[in-house]
Each structure stands twice: as C-alpha cells, then as structure tokens.
Design a protein with these regions (language model features):
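Generic structural signal for secondary-structure transition and capping sites
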Residues: 26, 153, 181, 205-208
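Charged, gly/pro-enriched flexible loop segments at helix/strand junctions
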Residues: 15, 197-212
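Short, polar/charged, Gly/Pro-enriched helix-capping and turn/loop motifs at alpha-helix termini
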Residues: 31, 115, 119, 206-210
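Basic, flexible linker segments flanking DNA-binding modules
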Residues: 2-61, 123-125, 132-133, 139-145
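Short, hydrophobic secondary-structure boundary micro-motifs
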Residues: 29-30, 158, 211-212
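RNase H-like DDE/DDD metal-dependent nuclease/strand-transfer catalytic core used by mobile genetic elements
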Residues: 53-77, 85-197, 201
Length: 212
C-alpha cells in the first residue's frame, strides 16, 4: 500500500502511514509474540536467614602457582550469601563434593549470627541427586541434603540452567573475579584461605544499597 501511495505522490514515511491507519481503525497492530521477561532474580528473603543462596566457584587456574599447576591441583570457593542482609560467607577447598558441601554448611551455621531457615542451590551433584533419575526414584539423599535435614534447614533448588535465580551469589562471584582473583597467585590452599578470609571481611564491609 505504502509503495503505491508513494508512487502517487504520498510523502509520509511508512511509519507515519501506519500511525494514520491505526487512528482510523483500519490497521491493528499485531500482538507481540515476545514473552514477558522473567525477573532477573528471585529474591524472597524477608528477614535474616529466611533464604541463603549457596554456590561453588572454580578458583581460576591462572591464579595457581606454577608448582600447584604442575601437580594438577585445583581449588574451589564455596559461597553463601543471605538474601536479606547480604552477609556473605566463603570457604576454600581442594575438592567440590557432597561431603565438602555438607562440611561447608556446618561451618556456615556457626558463622551466621542468625538461624538459617532455607538454603537454595543449583542442581549440581555436589548438592543434590535430583537430576539423577535412578537416585531420585530411590529417594536417595546426598550427604549435603542429609546434613540440612539434621540441622533443620529447608532445602530449595533453582530451575535447571537458570543461574539468575541464584543471582545474588552469582553476582558476588563476578566481584570476586574483578577484585580478588585479578592478578593474584596462590601458593597453597592455606595461602588462599588466609587471603580469602581477609577478602571476605572487605566484601562484607562494602557499602550496600538499602535493604528492601
């Protein structure tokens, strides 16, 4: 239509023509097929300890000393962050497993000055067997899940492949990468733990946005 009108001397743009047709009720804009975007994160913690996000970060290989790299050593950072207070706890290990995850939780409950009601993680096997059909059908709990049960802590997992549901802890790991791991070299697990403890204190003292 616009091409024919233009050939007849019509001077408006195609967008202008559509606006005129819409006002006259001749052209109805097709409804958008784009789905409403999901929230960037699911923050539901209403009070200290209501929900704590937990995740594991691989310590960058380039941060390991040449000697550690030659030995094939790998280090991991366990991280917990309370959704309401944003208080964060970290612990560094040389393996990530359901055993280490349960050990991390035991340390976490001693660190926080408040009782933890719910812990939320991804679906990794270091936390849960929910993506293992055989284990799930047998209702076989991991050591991590059993530890949470013994401690009276509710357990929640995010949707598979949806890390933004654990957005607060994910973003904290980006800050680790930019401000802690950048241009650092660690010579042992003890070295990493000592410097990581100092960084944890600095992180928890960063100015935060008002709660709410």
């Amino acid at each position: 239509m616009w091409v024919k009108l233009r050939d007849s001397g019509y001077t408006r743009t195609i967008q202008g023509l559509y606006h005129v047709l819409q006002r006259l009720g001749i052209y109805e804009k097709a409804p958008s097929k784009k789905k409403e975007s999901e929230p960037s994160e699911w923050i539901t913690g209403k009070y200290p300890g209501d929900k704590v996000q937990v995740d594991v970060k691989y310590v960058p290989k380039k941060c390991m000393s040449p000697d550690l790299q030659e030995k094939g050593e790998r280090f991991y950072q366990y991280t917990a962050i309370d959704e309401y207070t944003r208080i964060r706890y970290t612990w560094f290990t040389n393996e990530h497993s359901t055993y280490m995850s349960s050990e991390f939780v035991k340390r976490l409950v001693k660190y926080y000055p408040f009782k933890i009601k719910t812990i939320q993680t991804d679906n990794g096997f270091k936390f849960t067997n929910r993506l293992s059909l055989q284990a799930f059908l047998k209702n076989k709990k991991t050591m991590f899940e059993s530890t949470l049960e013994k401690l009276g802590i509710d357990y929640k997992v995010i949707k598979p492949h949806t890390p933004k549901q654990n957005g607060r802890v994910e973003r904290s790991h980006k800050k680790d990468q930019e401000r802690f791991y950048y241009k650092k070299v660690f010579y042992s697990l003890e070295d990493l733990r000592n410097r990581g403890k100092t960084w944890r204190k600095e992180y928890n003292n960063f100015p935060m946005r008002p709660l709410g």
